[in-house]
Amino acid sequence: MRFWVPLVGMTLSTFVFNTSEFMPIGLLTDIAADFNMTESAAGMLISVYAWAVMILSLPLMLCVTKVPPKRLLLGVIVLFSICQLLSAASVNFWMLMAARIGVAAAHAVFWSIITPLAVRVAPSSKASLALSMVGMGTSVAMIFGLPCGRMLGLAIG
């Protein structure tokens, strides 16, 4: 039963990471208006994020192979949080882009370790449950995270 708390934490983490990934999609028009640019130019924020995750995954994982998984997960969450705060405080598009690349780096490592970590904390008889819970965080982010993120973004500005 001890595995439930970390597993729920990992599920919530997948929700937060994916909501963060999807949120700019719902706010693209507002981002473009805030930085006085076209929506297609602001859309590079989403494309560069996706490319950064793809390109950084393998090199970053090669750099952190010796870091214990729990410490690595906590470090990734700290990096993610700091870069999200920098995103919120961005005064221009390029600062926002740099912060989002930092989030993408955290995202790349997060998705490389979260599923094996979920299976590791659960008893072997509950491995499929652990994987489905982590996957549920993604589904809930798509269904509720994106619209809630849009509402939050519009409310805060």
Regions found by a protein language model. Give the residues of each.
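Extracytoplasmic
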Residues: 6-39
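Residue-level signature of mid-helix packing/kink "hotspots" within the transmembrane helices
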Residues: 22, 50-58, 142-143
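Helix-breaking motifs and short loop linkers at transmembrane-helix boundaries and internal kinks
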Residues: 36, 68, 89-95, 106
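Conserved MFS/SLC helix-loop-helix module at the cytosolic interface between two early adjacent transmembrane helices
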Residues: 55-91
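Paired small-residue
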Residues: 83, 94-102
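Helix-loop-helix hairpin linking two adjacent transmembrane segments in secondary transporters
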Residues: 95, 133-157
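Cytoplasmic helix-loop-helix junction between adjacent transmembrane helices
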Residues: 99-137
